[in-house]
């Protein structure tokens, strides 16, 4: 079966091997007589699925033993509240809410600081809003505050298509705050330098699996500082102490994510995926930059390898472009409503053949309209 190529920003395309495997196991997982979605989360069958997914993810992302891996719910948007509920009091007296620094580089980090203001004092350490979120403020320019509990960045902005290709070293900047990284839209697309990270979180629905699962990787010394008002199910220490089963976890989403982890291992792991992703992004950006019809607004040194926004110089052609793309089996290319234009999300599951098909269509559409 030749499926269309899905460029959705999330929920996003899944590896076809994973979908085929899940379909085969839908009614009877490994002779258990049950679908995974019917299993008790405390039964031995699902516990084995959870434990394998946990082990595979730690191996794939090279997560040190000093970090806890949590499988939670609520997505990245919920983590914008859960993080300050857990970390803002870390360096404050008597468990009072403290402060946090935010680097605002696009729509998602903007939402993050807006949500955090409900629970702690927020300092905007840097922002690229004045240039339309098309560049990234270098860490040396950040105005970090003294005594902040953490510094929050979105390392890849899904909407605006900017990416920090290297995580900042807060210690080198003279800050003792923990670095919090929203890596929802490029987790598992490249290695992570955990020596620079205090906490990383990611909604699974872009690069790890289906919607419903949220990954949190948190350094152990950051546990146990939650505000008194933090709900028990969102208290990282409570979740960690109960192996992510304090409340019923998103069992089927964990199962599918586990299949994705195994697929990633078969592809050669994260380093292999990074090389593949760099090649895909280079192919697409080259086609856009060397065209007469399309353009990308983001500075080349901070372009996202996962989310590629682009625009037609003649916007009256937008509808025709999208209709033609669908006819060519290229789906979900419409840009975010706040930005307009087009966007191609080329996550791990997008094969090089899919990007090449898009590039071929870009050339064909331009030729017909010239």
UniProtKB/Swiss-Prot annotation:
Top-level class of the enzyme under EC nomenclature: transferase
Subcellular location: Cytoplasm
Binding sites annotated in the UniProt record for L-glutamate: 42
GO biological process, one term: L-serine biosynthetic process
Main localization, broad class: cytoplasm
E.C. code: 2.6.1.52
Keyword Transmembrane: no
The record's free-text note on cofactor binding: Binds 1 pyridoxal phosphate per subunit.
GO CC entries: cytoplasm
Pathway(s) the chain acts in: Amino-acid biosynthesis; L-serine biosynthesis; L-serine from 3-phospho-D-glycerate: step 2/3; Cofactor biosynthesis; pyridoxine 5'-phosphate biosynthesis; pyridoxine 5'-phosphate from D-erythrose 4-phosphate: step 3/5
SUPFAM superfamilies per record: PLP-dependent transferases (SSF53383)
Keywords tagged on the record: Amino-acid biosynthesis, Aminotransferase, Cytoplasm, Pyridoxal phosphate, Pyridoxine biosynthesis, Serine biosynthesis, Transferase
Catalytic activity reported: O-phospho-L-serine + 2-oxoglutarate = 3-phosphooxypyruvate + L-glutamate; 4-(phosphooxy)-L-threonine + 2-oxoglutarate = (R)-3-hydroxy-2-oxo-4-phosphooxybutanoate + L-glutamate
Cofactor(s) needed: pyridoxal 5'-phosphate
PTM annotation (N6-(pyridoxal phosphate)lysine): residues: 206
An MF annotation (GO) of this entry: O-phospho-L-serine:2-oxoglutarate aminotransferase activity
Binding site for pyridoxal 5'-phosphate: 108, 158, 182, 205, 247-248
Family stated for the protein in its record: Belongs to the class-V pyridoxal-phosphate-dependent aminotransferase family. SerC subfamily.
Subunit note: Homodimer.
NCBIfam families: PRK05355.1, serC_1
Biological function: Catalyzes the reversible conversion of 3-phosphohydroxypyruvate to phosphoserine and of 3-hydroxy-2-oxo-4-phosphonooxybutanoate to phosphohydroxythreonine.
Protein name, UniProt field: Phosphoserine aminotransferase
Native species: Albidiferax ferrireducens (strain ATCC BAA-621 / DSM 15236 / T118) (Rhodoferax ferrireducens)
């Amino acid at each position: 079966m030749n499926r269309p190529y899905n460029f959705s920003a999330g929920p996003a395309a899944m590896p076809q091997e994973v979908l085929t495997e899940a379909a085969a196991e839908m009614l009877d997982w490994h002779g258990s007589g049950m679908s995974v979605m019917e299993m008790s989360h405390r039964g031995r069958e699902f516990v084995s699925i959870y434990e394998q997914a946990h082990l595979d993810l730690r191996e794939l992302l090279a997560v040190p033993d000093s970090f806890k891996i949590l499988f939670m719910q609520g997505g990245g948007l919920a983590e914008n509240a859960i993080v300050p509920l857990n970390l803002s009091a870390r360096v404050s007296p008597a468990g009072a809410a403290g402060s946090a620094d935010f680097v605002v580089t696009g729509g998602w980090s903007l939402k993050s600081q807006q949500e955090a203001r409900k629970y702690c004092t927020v300092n905007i350490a840097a922002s690229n809003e004045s240039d339309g979120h098309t560049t990234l403020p270098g860490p040396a320019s950040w105005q970090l505050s003294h005594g902040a509990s953490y510094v929050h960045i979105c390392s890849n902005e899904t909407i605006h298509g900017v990416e920090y290709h290297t995580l900042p070293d807060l210690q080198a900047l003279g800050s003792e705050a923990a670095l919090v990284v929203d890596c929802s839209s490029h987790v598992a697309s490249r290695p992570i330098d955990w020596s620079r990270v205090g906490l990383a979180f990611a909604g699974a629905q872009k690069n790890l699996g289906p919607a419903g699962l949220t990954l949190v990787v948190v350094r152990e010394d950051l546990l146990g500082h939650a505000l008194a008002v933090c709900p028990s199910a969102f208290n990282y220490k409570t979740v960690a102490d109960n192996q992510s089963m304090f409340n019923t976890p998103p069992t089927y989403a964990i199962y599918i994510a586990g299949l994705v982890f195994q697929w990633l291992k078969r592809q050669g792991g994260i380093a292999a995926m990074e090389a593949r992703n760099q090649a895909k992004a280079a192919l697409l950006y080259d086609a856009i930059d060397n065209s007469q019809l399309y353009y990308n607004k983001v500075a080349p040194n901070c372009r996202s390898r996962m989310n590629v926004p682009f625009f037609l110089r003649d916007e009256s052609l937008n509808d025709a472009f999208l209709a033609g793309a669908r006819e060519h089996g290229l789906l979900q290319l419409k840009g975010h409503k706040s930005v307009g234009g087009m966007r191609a999300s080329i996550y791990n599951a997008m094969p090089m053949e899919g990007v090449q098909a898009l590039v071929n269509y870009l050339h064909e559409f331009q030729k017909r309209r010239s």
